[in-house]
């Protein structure tokens, strides 16, 4: 009798660059830091803020055409996540890899204007028409994080543009 062995799909390694981190506070404020550049973020509540941070990470992932690593601190806990260009959010393994995306769906969150649930990758709310329905950036005289060109996100001396989260140990709103 011949034995068959299941073939496991290789797990995807998520690079540690760019460095994306977020700090989320209970009052719906926090910070989003990309490669050392910290920007304030704010929303009406924590749920809107989480979705907005994930939306920013998904936009960065889409520009880089690969998942990005997101470290989220929501005291007292910290999670290391990966956000895919499609808006799917996953916990990273201890080896910094991601399991298959099979069966997972993009993160959804409420529009900042009308509250209608939609994928974090939505550029315009289909219900109220507002652009960037998950935007949480607080603009203080500089470009919004999403306005930064991909060229500003490269490591000096390279052209490589190779990497957000939430939860109770699991990924929230990943329905």
Enumerate the predicted regions with their spans.
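Hydrophobic alpha-helical segments that drive targeting, anchoring, or assembly
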Residues: 2-132, 175
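Long, charge-rich boundary regions
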Residues: 41-44, 137-175
